[in-house]
Amino acid sequence: MRMSSGFGRTLREAPSEAELAAHQLILRAGLARQLLAGGMALLPLGMRVFRRIEAIMHAELAAIGAGEFRTPVVHAASLWEQTGRYAQYGEAMLRFNNRNQQALLFAPTHEEAVAELARREVDSYRQLPSLLYQIHTKYRDELRVRGGLLRLREFTMLDAYSLDTDWAGLDMVYDRVALAFETIFERCGVRFTAVEADGGEMGGREPREYMAFSSSGEDSLVVCPLCSYAANSEVAVRGQAAANDDVVPAMSEIATPACTTIAELATFLQVSEAQTAKAVFFNSAEKGLIFVVVRGDREVNEIKLRAAAGVSALEPATLEQISAVGAVAGYASPVGLSNVTVIADHSVVGVGGLVAGANRTGYHLQNVVYGRDWQATVVADIANVEEGDACPVCGAALSLERGIEIGHIFKLGTRYTEALGATYLDPQGQAQPIVMGSYGIGLERLLQVIIEQHHDEKGIVWPASVAPFDLHLVQLGASATVSEAANQLYQQLSEAGLSVLYDDRNESAGVKFNDADLLGMPLRLTVGERGLKQNVVELRQRATGVVETIALDQVVKSIKNIEHRA
C-alpha cells in the first residue's frame, strides 16, 4: 500500500480525551477514529491488524474442529424473555420495536440465539457433540465507555458455542477450547493469565477469564508467584490462618465516646485495626437484613457475599432496618442479637479476642470471641484478598496485579437449553436437554492490548504475527534514481509474498522516520541517494533497533531470512 494514496493520517499529538498510552497510539497512528461515544471506526491500518487477528482465530478454531456459523444481531425479545435475561440485562440492552410493533433487541450476546438454533436443528444424540463459532457484532449500552477500544458499546467478539449430550462431553471440549484460546493469545504476542472468575448473568460452572497483564487494567488480579493459582479479585480466596487457641479473658464493656469508625476506635484504644471486628449491613430481597462481620482491616467483597448469602443482589441497609434488629449503627456487633442473618468472614473466627460494638452508643466490647460470645448463620470467605495474604493452594504470599479481560469461557450446562426447550433424543429415545458451553474473545479489546504490551516512547512495536504490514519501505528523496529503485523493490517484495507499506510521500526524512517508528512495522527498509551510489539499502528492525546494510540484489533473501528466524 502506498502511503500517498492511503486513507487516514498520523497525528503528532494525541487528542486530549485519550489518557491511556495504547489509546493515544491508536489515534496517533491512524488505526481508528471515534465517531460517537462507544463507537469507533477502524481505518485501513487498523483493519489490517483486525483481519490478521481474525485469521489466527479462524486457524485455531478450525484446528479443533469448530464450524463457522452466523446468527442475526437483532433478536426477538420473546426469546430472551424465556430465559429471564430480557429483564435481567436492564438498561445495557438496546431495545426497539419494528414497524409491526414486534419487540426486538440488538444482541449483547448470542446464547439465546444458539440455544434456539439448536432446538430447531438437533433431534438426536447422533448429531452431537458440535462446536460452532462466529466472529460477529454485539451491542451493549454501557453506562460508561472508556479507553479507546477497551470498552465500546458496539464491538466484535469471537464467540464459540459447544453442544454436548452430557457434562463429561462439555468438560472435554471446554479444555480443547481453552487450549485454542491460549494459543491465539500466544500467537498474538500477548502476556496473559487464566483466572477464576464470577459467572455474572451468564451463569454456569467454572467461569474462567483470560487477563492480559496491564498496569492500566481495570481489573484486579490475585496471583500466586509459586503455583498456578490465579483469580479475579472479585472471587479470589485466601488461605486460612491456623486457629488461635489461647485462653481469652471474659468479654467486657468499655466506653468509647465518638468512636463510630474502625480508625477512630483503633486510635482511641491504641490497638491495630486487625484487632477489631467491623459490622457492615446489607439488605436483600430474598433474606432481608444481612449482618456482615469482617476483621477491622478488611473490606467486604460483595460478589463473594452474595454467593455466601444465596441472594441475587445487595443494597446498603437503612438506619431503620439496622435499628429494627437491635443493632446500633457505629457501635454494632452480633453479640446478643437474634432473628437476623449473620455472615462472618473467616478473619474473625479462631483469632482470639477482638474489639466489637456493644450495640450501645458510646460503648464497645473487648475480648469478643466467636463461638463463645456470638455465632454466625454462615462463616465464609467474604473479604477482599490483599497483598501478602496466603495462597489457598500452596500458602505462598499472594500478589495483586492489574489486568484487562480479553476472553472468557463458561460451562453453561442446561440453563439456556432447558428454558428454550432445546433437547435431543438419547439412545433410549428419551428427551434430554442439550449441554452448552460458551467461549468468547473481544477483538477490538485484544487489538488494543497488543499495543498496550508492545510499544515504546516512539510508538507501536508490532509483533510480526499481527503487524499491518511485514515491512515499511521508506523512500528518501524524489529523484528518478531513488523513485525507480524504491518502486522496483516495492514490486519485488510484493511479488515475494511480503506485505509492504510504501512511504512514497513528499515529506522530509525526519517526518518519514518518525512515522515509521510510530506505525511500528517489524522492519523498515530505507532507500536513499547515498546508499544507492553503493548499490545498498538500510534495513532496521523495529523491536531491537538493529541496523544492517544490504545489497540491492539481496534484499528479498535477507528479509525472508529475518522472517524465518522470527
UniProtKB/Swiss-Prot annotation:
Taxonomy, superkingdom: Bacteria
Enzyme nomenclature, EC number: 6.1.1.15
Keywords: Aminoacyl-tRNA synthetase, ATP-binding, Cytoplasm, Ligase, Nucleotide-binding, Protein biosynthesis
Catalyzed reactions: tRNA(Pro) + L-proline + ATP = L-prolyl-tRNA(Pro) + AMP + diphosphate
PROSITE patterns named among the record's database cross-references: AA_TRNA_LIGASE_II
Biological process (GO), any one: prolyl-tRNA aminoacylation
A GO molecular function held by the record: proline-tRNA ligase activity
Disulphides: none
Family to which this protein belongs: Belongs to the class-II aminoacyl-tRNA synthetase family. ProS type 1 subfamily.
The protein's assembly and partners: Homodimer.
Domain notes: Consists of three domains: the N-terminal catalytic domain, the editing domain and the C-terminal anticodon-binding domain.
Protein name from the UniProt record: Proline--tRNA ligase
Provenance organism: Herpetosiphon aurantiacus (strain ATCC 23779 / DSM 785 / 114-95)
Gene: proS
